[in-house]
Amino acid sequence: MLISSSRRKSPVYFANALLGKKLASYIAKHDFDIVVTPHLYPAETMTYMKKKKLLHIPAVAVGTDYTCIPFWEETDLDYYVIPHEDLIPEYVKRGVPEEKLLPYGIPVQQDFCRNLSKEVARKKKLHLPMDVPMFLVMSGSMGFGKLAVFAAELALRCRNGEHIVIICGNNAKIERILRKEFHFNKRVHIIGYTNHVSLFMDACDVIYTKPGGLTSTRSLVKNIPIVHTAPIPGCETANLHFFGARHLSVSSKHLAKQVQLGKALIENDSLREQMSEAQCRERKPEAAMQIVSLLERLVSHE
């Protein structure tokens, strides 16, 4: 079994422990004051380093999914920044000490913590049409497989002048397919890789996205109605359940139902307002600043 327990370490731990001496040498060479990691593997490595007295500076982990992923319980860092206070019992049950848990939230870039008006985002920045309902479809950094089918279904159902912006990420193939498919449809805007995701979020009325931790958090902080599409089993499933249970998003595993949910949100002011209110209660836009403050305190030994 690969899962660890309080009595034994997993093969994952021992594999990452092999990097301990190299990481210790790198840290010493560059004279770092503190280490922050959003990933399990370096946390495993630094746990080994602490055990062997090879790590002499503080180390902090930042969780980027709305669940306690496997193997966190066999790590031993100074603090664990987690997405939400409701996750504390799950982490504690898995064996992470409660006094090390800080529910600051998932940090996002400052652009996502500021909202531009739709007029500024659409007209002055992105040159998109004003006064029309607009969907934003996020494919993820590599695009998701059923994007072309989903886009065709959504475009077919948009009969009231709605526009669709599709961000394809790094998937050049799906971008070419969609540009060809919607070449004559002026209400569908195909975007490849872009550094302006925050602006597109400001411009849209409803966002479709897979339930990844970072994209979901960015949408939550932006206070945008969210329709979650089919998750990759594992962390994304946990993220979807966390958001759904708190009315931060709606979701369905069926493509046609996903389209229907987005249409309902864009057409029903009351539904959007209810989700917006829930998001305002749960979002944590100050996460990044709180983490920076924590690191400064640890470095200054306060």
Task: Identify the residue ranges that each predicted region occupies.
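A short alpha->beta transition loop at the rim of the catalytic pocket in nucleotide-sugar-dependent
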Residues: C204-D205, N223-P225
